From Swiss-Prot:
Belongs to the formate--tetrahydrofolate ligase family. It catalyses: (6S)-5,6,7,8-tetrahydrofolate + formate + ATP = (6R)-10-formyltetrahydrofolate + ADP + phosphate. The lineage of its organism: Bacteria, Pseudomonadati, Pseudomonadota, Gammaproteobacteria, Alteromonadales. Pathway: One-carbon metabolism; tetrahydrofolate interconversion. Keywords: ATP-binding, Ligase, Nucleotide-binding, One-carbon metabolism. This is Formate--tetrahydrofolate ligase. InterPro entries: Formate_THF_ligase, Formate_THF_ligase_CS, P-loop_NTPase.
Length: 585
């Protein structure tokens, strides 16, 4: 079979205007970037304000493994197959970060015959949204540092006289807004700024990856440009010496930050290999952010299509949970059904019976099975790993929506093991189970899956949130740990307890929680496979994201700036003699 890159480069593409018109967009509602990409103007929402909305399908997965489960492959394949059976369908997915592209994970355009094309354009830069987020974010960091410098240099009276601005009295050790870059770079996790004469005061700072920026979450959760402007104004950049918040609005930088992102709020339209439309917008990670594409992209697609297929990052304990408790809480758009992706390899890797260590995963040691073992039939490991799939089935079902299991078939899979797995799933709480060959067959490979999803979406949704707004922060943490992960409880550090009290006193206790934890286990510990029990979730820090509208709980050793592994992806990427990019995948 051809590589993903070869398949993409040989694809026969339609002009993106044709894709948009077929979806229901007007030519003037598309801002063209060549023939393959277009920004969608938000004026389409006004034109279609009274339009009946389609059905939203959320794709999630079992606990991820280094072998890849094929969640985006399934999302794109399902969209292609829904269109093939006569349903009007559109995919809505996130923009890939270059950190994982050059790191371990690689691109995020799907794969095989179920991918967004041209895949190299999607995986590198796209229409520049992530760069806009980085620039706007770093403007905020530069602004707070400059304000601190001038206030310290002049003092209150002289500063107000010369600048005409209010003295903010910034506490240097309480600056909360640091800098971002769209790369994995561990040496930037802890830095000092303001060093040298006329550059200070000095204070400790850091870099996060851009996908972890609150601006990325705001981009994903805003309803329109005006809403984004209000949210950016609420950003808490620092505290003053009295412990009061200093916002981007207080600093006077919110308008300029919004201006930088004025085009970034428009989703980008691309196409799949069979010409199905795909809206790509925002890129928050699911382990250190809320892990879902934008409300705006969903809203546009739902007014134009019968079915909209979106996905949450990593397993159902991560992106799906945040889709429900953060995104749906703010959008009001509940899903009609969920698709839960699994593979035989994933279940064996999640069996807890593997012993080999993956040395290429940065910061953590993750048990894995080598390729030779994982491709061989092994009923004992499969049955042990099924417990993980069954947990995820029940986890999705507790939100009141029907769940369809999609088994992403690999060429090496055993027919007997596939049959056993289908029978096991059909005896579970899942609505149905289908084998997907979308990777190898494109639209023809997920017809049965599409038909089952349509039937599942006909059931009246009983969607429910995991916890109410009015619950205390401690109660929300306990619910997420005990119900969301099956933990015995939650443990807050002294700092986290103080932060919970402070955030509640400041009026932020009603916000939902965004748990930043490892995606490689249902628990906080990546070495605990299958369905861990009797563990306590350690919360070390609570971070306010007032603009996005949630509070992040940092769990265990999770980092907001990844590092490159021993064998980074950039080693395979180059330009060939024809000037074409090679090695992406």
């Amino acid at each position: 079979m051809l590589t993903d890159m070869d398949i993409s480069s040989r694809a026969s593409l339609k002009n993106i205007t044709e894709i948009g018109v077929d979806l229901g967009l007007l030519p003037e509602e598309m801002m063209l970037f060549g023939h393959t990409k277009a920004k969608v103007e938000l004026s389409v929402l006004q034109r279609l304000a009274g339009q009946r909305k389609g059905k939203l399908i959320i794709v999630t997965a079992v606990t991820p493994t280094p072998h890849g489960e094929g969640k985006t492959v399934t999302s794109i394949g399902l969209t292609q197959s829904l269109n093939a059976i006569g349903q009007k369908a559109c995919a809505c997915i996130r923009q890939p970060s270059m950190g994982p592209v050059f790191g371990v994970k690689g691109g995020a355009a799907g794969g095989g015959y179920a991918q967004v094309v041209p895949m190299q354009e999607m995986n590198l830069h796209l229409t520049g949204d992530i760069h806009a987020v980085s620039s706007a974010h770093n403007l905020g960091a530069a602004a707070i540092a400059a304000r601190l410098f001038h206030e310290a240099r002049l003092g209150k009276t002289e500063f107000e006289a010369q600048s005409g601005q209010a003295f903010l009295d910034i506490a240097p050790n309480e600056i909360r807004w640091h800098r971002v870059v769209d790369h994995n770079d561990r040496c930037l996790r802890q830095i000092h700024v303001g060093l040298g004469d006329n550059n200070g005061p000095e204070y400790g700072s850091s870099f996060d990856i851009t996908a972890a920026s609150e601006l990325m979450a705001i981009l994903a959760l805003s309803h329109d440009l005006a809403d984004m402007r209000v949210r950016i104004g609420r950003l808490v950049l620092a505290l003053n010496t009295q412990g009061q918040v200093i916002t981007a609005e207080d600093l006077g930088v919110a308008g300029a930050m919004t201006a930088i992102m004025a085009d970034a709020i428009k989703p980008t339209l691309m196409q799949t290999l069979n010409g199905s439309p795909c809206l790509i917008h925002s890129g928050p990670f699911a382990n250190i952010a809320h892990g879902n594409s934008s409300i705006i992209a969903d809203d546009i697609a739902l007014r134009l299509a019968d079915f909209v297929v979106t996905e949450g990052g990593f397993g159902s304990d991560m992106g799906f949970e945040k889709f429900c408790n953060i995104k749906v809480r703010q959008s009001g758009q509940a899903p009609a059904a969920a698709v839960l992706v699994t593979t035989l390899k994933a279940l064996k890797a999640n069996s807890g019976l593997a012993t080999e260590v993956d040395s290429n995963v940065s910061n953590i040691h993750v048990p894995k099975i080598n390729a030779a073992n994982i491709n061989a039939p092994d009923q004992a490991r499969l049955e042990a790993g099924f417990a993980n799939l069954n947990w995820h089935i029940n986890n999705v079902a507790r939100y009141g929506i029907p769940v369809v299991v999609a088994i992403n078939r690999f060429a090496t899979d055993s027919d007997a093991e596939l049959q056993w797995l289908m029978e096991a799933v059909n005896a579970s709480a899942a609505f149905g189970c289908e084998i997907s060959d979308a990777f190898s067959q494109g639209e023809a490979g997920a017809i049965a899956l599409a038909q089952t999803v349509v039937r599942a979406a006909e059931i009246e949704s009983q969607f429910k949130l995991l916890y109410p707004d009015e619950a205390s922060l401690e109660a929300k943490l306990s619910t997420l740990a005990e119900v969301g992960y099956g933990a015995a409880g939650v443990s807050l550090s002294i700092e986290a307890k103080q932060q919970a009290q402070q955030l509640t006193a400041l009026g932020y206790g009603h916000l939902p929680l965004c748990m930043a934890k490892t995606p490689l286990s249902i628990s906080h510990d990546p070495s605990l496979k299958g369905v861990p029990k009797d563990f306590v979730v350690p919360v070390r820090e609570l971070v306010l994201h007032a603009g996005a509208g949630f509070i992040t709980a940092l769990v265990g050793n999770v980092m907001t700036m990844p590092g490159l592994g021993l064998k980074p992806g950039y080693l395979k990427i180059d330009i060939d003699a024809k000037g074409e990019i090679v090695g992406l995948g």
